[in-house]
A protein has these predicted regions:
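A solvent-exposed interaction/effector surface
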Residues: 1-171
């Protein structure tokens, strides 16, 4: 049956995924803690913007075209989460004012790319389904996931590109 112009068809979105290892690393950047509603209202994007303004002040940056957006569970019973905007460093010799250093353990990750024009929710649904289909589950860690953002991308872009990395273990 033909569809009218008012009906929308569901577009298939593919996010090819794979398993990768990431060695432990040290990072320096900014910390944010808040609710999912605050994050949805843009407070993380504002923090990312502040981070990018201060990026050049971080010594010993490991060369990369990306910065990390790392999310952790908040304290038990809390209504939100903790998010860091950081860059990997070769060593911590000095920490710029208002920033901190963070140690990220060596973990196994499921990885996929979210591209412009895709639904962010669908990208996360796709990688979650892929993890299950491969016989993995989310790892029991405080770190829930991280995203790799291009340094040249505007944090306020309504159509961002980034890489999703979710810690996993065999089910």
């Amino acid at each position: 049956m033909p569809q009218s112009n008012n009906e929308q068809t569901e577009v298939t979105q593919e996010n090819p995924s794979f398993i990768t290892e990431k060695a432990a690393f040290t990072a320096v950047g900014l910390r944010w803690e808040g609710s999912f509603a605050e994050a949805g209202a843009g407070s993380i994007r504002a923090m990312h913007q502040r981070f990018l303004v201060q990026y050049e002040t971080i010594p010993n940056r490991v060369p990369s075209p990306y910065f990390y957006g790392i999310s952790y569970h908040a304290a038990p019973g809390a209504a939100g989460f903790v998010h860091y905007a950081v860059v990997e460093v070769s060593e911590v010799s000095a920490i710029p004012d208002g920033m901190l250093s963070l140690e990220v353990p060596s973990l196994t990750y499921a990885r996929c790319d979210h591209r412009k024009g895709q639904s962010i929710d669908r990208s996360y649904q796709n990688i979650g389904a892929w993890i299950d289909a491969q016989g993995y589950r989310l790892a029991d860690t405080e770190l829930t996931h991280f995203e790799l953002y291009p340094l040249v991308q505007d944090p306020y872009s309504g159509d961002p590109e980034f890489t999703i990395m979710m810690p996993v273990e065999k089910a």
